[in-house]
Every structure is written in structure tokens, then in C-alpha cells.
Amino acid sequence: MVARVERPQPNIFLIDNMVFVPGGTFRMGSDRHYPEEAPAHRVAVDGFWIDRTPVTNAQFDAFVTATGYVTSAERVPLAADYPGTPPEMLQPASLVFAQPKDSASLHDWRRWWELRFGASWKRPHGKDDPRGAQGDHPVVHVAYEDAQAYAAWAGKDLPTEAEWEFAARGGLDGADYAWGDEPMPQGRFMANTWRGRFPDFNSAADGC
């Protein structure tokens, strides 16, 4: 999750933790991969400010402490919203990445993600896992409405899909990846990249 503003207030802390992305045009989407990304088309984006990094657990904790906000993953699901669901399944939960023990299709998300009770931004791996949220790690298990609430509290807004893709591309118009067209340039795994305006690519599952 990253936040953006068009005209930030004269706040040094705010400016220091954001970067300005000059406006421009780029080819958004792709005709070569997922159907929902098509058709590729030219888009014009005005200049905007955006967070240098994804929102951290420490930043999100400050928001929760100040407002008492409860994320969607922490709420008890309503039976009316999920008719036919066994009562024992109506518990706060979220999907957690779980690497398959054997080979699995990249297109079958059920082989890579599992529902864990108690998983939330406070307990990213589930309630039974002793590892808690690290303060400087990107906040996870936040839904779109949670991200909107945080951004409003911070006096910002969420980037549009076009703004996010424009910033993440870092000037590489039409490239498949934020660093170019090769999935593993020179045999190296590119889990995170610093090429763009900020190192946001693949650091956490972005929902905006």
C-alpha cells in the first residue's frame, strides 16, 4: 500500500518521505499476459507526489492507535454475507502465502495461498505463529477500504491504477518488468528493484 497527494501541505516530514513524479504519457496495460490487462493503451498522467516506500507496520500502527480502526481481516464475518458457511469458519482470517511442497501451477492461486485464522497486519503469518509484524516491514492483510481509511487519516489519497503503474515503471514504457523485459537478467532474481521512483515492485502484494 502506498499513498499519494497532488499538492502536499508545507510539512517537511511529509515532503521528506515522498517523491514527486512528473506527469507524462505511457503505454498502460499489456496485450501479452492476463486478459484483464488488455488492451494496452496510451494514458496521460498529471504530476503527483507519492510515498517513497510502501506504508510500514509502524505507520499503520500509529493510525490504528490514533483512531481505534479495525481492519477487515480482524472483523468477525457476518453469516448473512456468507450463507451456508459453517459457524466454525466465521472467524477473522486472511490469506497467507504458503509455498507448495511440490511443483504447482502459477495460475492456481489455491496452491500458493491458504486461509489462516487470526492472520492480520498484527500477525501476518496467523494467530498461531509467534512472529509478529516488524515495524519497518510493509503492512499487509489490508483491504482496499482499510487503505482508504489510512490514506484519509494521513491527509493523502491512494494512487490510481495509472499513477501506480506510471511510477513503478520508472520511465520504461511498455516493458514487462520494472527493470526491463527479461524475467531474470544475467541469471539474477529481481525480487525488488530500485530502478523506478521508489522500490515498490514486488515488496508486498499490492492491492491498489
Give residue ranges: language-model regions.
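GGW-centered surface loops in extracellular recognition modules
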Residues: I12-F20
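C-terminal, low-complexity/hydrophilic appendages and adjacent surface loops
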Residues: P35-A38
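Short active-site loop at a secondary-structure junction
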Residues: R42-V55, A133-V142
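Short capping motifs at secondary-structure boundaries
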Residues: F48, F63-S72, A154
